[in-house]
Every structure is written in structure tokens, then in C-alpha cells.
């Protein structure tokens, strides 16, 4: 019984962590993160570092595959962050 209780507790903690990362817009994410994903499942993700996948910044702040790059980096034509 204790094992079942422990498993349930761990599962609930994991679900709370997943839910806390969901977002509806950029305003839901902390600094250094953007709201990215499909229409049904968006999560706060970190801005892209050097060589990581990215999407160019846009005025609507809507991203599906990944976030824009960190400051001082730019998103190349092959959607990878590189030095500006």
C-alpha cells in the first residue's frame, strides 16, 4: 500500500510540473522563455542558444517549432541560432 501511495504522489508531482509549464501566450512565460507549440499543447521553452533550433521573432509572438534565439544571436535561414 505504501508503494502505491508513493507512486501516486510522484505521479501527481510530475503532472503539476507539466501543467505549470503550459502557456497560452508569451505573457505566461518567465524571462528567457517563449510560448511555443501546437494550438493544443504549448509550453514555455528557453530561447535558442548557439547552434540550437530556432524560429525568427515575429510581431505576434507565435512560435510552433521553437523559440527565437537568445540576445546577440540570430536565427539563420536553416533555423539555427548563430552569432549576429
From Swiss-Prot:
Signal sequence annotation: 1-21
Disulfide bond residue pairs: 23-35, 29-44, 34-67, 54-75, 69-81
Cellular compartments annotated: Secreted
UniProt entry keywords in alphabetical sequence: Disulfide bond, Secreted, Signal, Toxin
Listed GO CC annotations: extracellular region
Tissue specificity field: Expressed by the venom gland.
One Pfam short name: Prokineticin
Single annotated GO MF: toxin activity
InterPro entries: Prokineticin_domain
Family statement: Belongs to the AVIT (prokineticin) family.
Stated name of the protein: U8-theraphotoxin-Hhn1e
Lineage: Eukaryota, Metazoa, Ecdysozoa, Arthropoda, Chelicerata
Amino acid at each position: 500500500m505504501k508503494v502505491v501511495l508513493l507512486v501516486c504522489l510522484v505521479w501527481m508531482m510530475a503532472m503539476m510540473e507539466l501543467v505549470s509549464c503550459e502557456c497560452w501566450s508569451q505573457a505566461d512565460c518567465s524571462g528567457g522563455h517563449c510560448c511555443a507549440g501546437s494550438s493544443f499543447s504549448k509550453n514555455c521553452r528557453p530561447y535558442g542558444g548557439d547552434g540550437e533550433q530556432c524560429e525568427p521573432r515575429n510581431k505576434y509572438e507565435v512560435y510552433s517549432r521553437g523559440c527565437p534565439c537568445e540576445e546577440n544571436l540570430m536565427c539563420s535561414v536553416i533555423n539555427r541560432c548563430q552569432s549576429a
